[in-house]
Amino acid sequence: MWNKNRLTQMLSIEYPIIQAGMAGSTTPKLVASVSNSGGLGTIGAGYFNTQQLEDEIDYVRQLTSNSFGVNVFVPSQQSYTSSQIENMNAWLKPYRRALHLEEPVVKITEEQQFKCHIDTTIKKQVPVCCFTFGIPSESIIKRLKEANIKLIGTATSVDEAIANEKAGMDAIVAQGSEAGGHRGSFLKPKNQLPMVGTISLVPQIVDVVSIPVIAAGGIMDGRGVLASIVLGAEGVQMGTAFLTSQDSNASELLRDAIINSKETDTVVTKAFSGKLARGINNRFIEEMSQYEGDIPDYPIQNELTSSIRKAAANIGDKELTHMWSGQSPRLATTHPANTIMSNIINQINQIMQYK
């Protein structure tokens, strides 16, 4: 059976399909629907405060008794100067003026937020905790393991996968360059951050680690799931496939943009957040590209552009807000999450029967 392996057993799920924990875009209905369909629904906790995360977990539990997870951002060392912030504020001034916005006060609460997310995950006994942007400290990993919480790390290179296994992760997401949203890279190479495609990355990671590997990036249907399994993955993580679902928190602006875009429309940019992320190209990205080397690191840039992005989205201006998407938008649908899950499973079973 294609759907029975170490990962499904470890996570107590029927099918090795994980809905990515997309911060700002998941809803209790989406998470529970995926879990009720036999996959692993994941709460995108990245931007939640403690109360919001507690409420989200409680709501998910009202909708499902099945396993689910929480995805959290691991804090990173920020590298920026006051002149970078001053320059960026000057460059962003025309956008703020056009949208009638004040210059924001930057508040960095990453460390405290992360600690609260971990405390809440343990307090609420969430079955699975997924990490992106790095690996948590040894003490945090120990606390989570003592609470019998399964840990899933993210890797965009073989070296990052090895580091995840060494740190004690129970499974690893191999995030290919096709993936939408933020890159999970955390080891800084000599030249540039890894941009290795899923079909290349997965088998190379599988060959050097002993824990289950989860393929991510460009996977939208049963064909992608089966291809990943053939490459040695024991599961897949899908983001964009569920982002356009009517159960997600995506705006109609974003949903329509993805549904109507093509595979050549996305780019990888730091313009919105200070961290590389894949999204649909627009005017803001193109105009900010001239400052690429001077953009402050995440979360500084994320704070500086936040009000611009929100205001633009509120008035339906897709040229000034982030439109995260993977490279397979032609395969996106607006079906409910349970329909997406059943379509994937049925397609896999049909292919297996045909073969």
Swiss-Prot record:
Cofactor: FMN
Gene Ontology BP, a term: response to toxic substance
Gene3D superfamilies: Aldolase class I
Cofactor binding description: Binds 1 FMN per subunit.
Keyword check for Transmembrane helix: no
InterPro entries found in the cross-reference section: Aldolase_TIM, NMO
Family: Belongs to the nitronate monooxygenase family. NMO class I subfamily.
PANTHER family: NITRONATE MONOOXYGENASE-RELATED
Name of the protein described by the UniProt record: Probable nitronate monooxygenase
UniProt source species: Staphylococcus aureus (strain MW2)
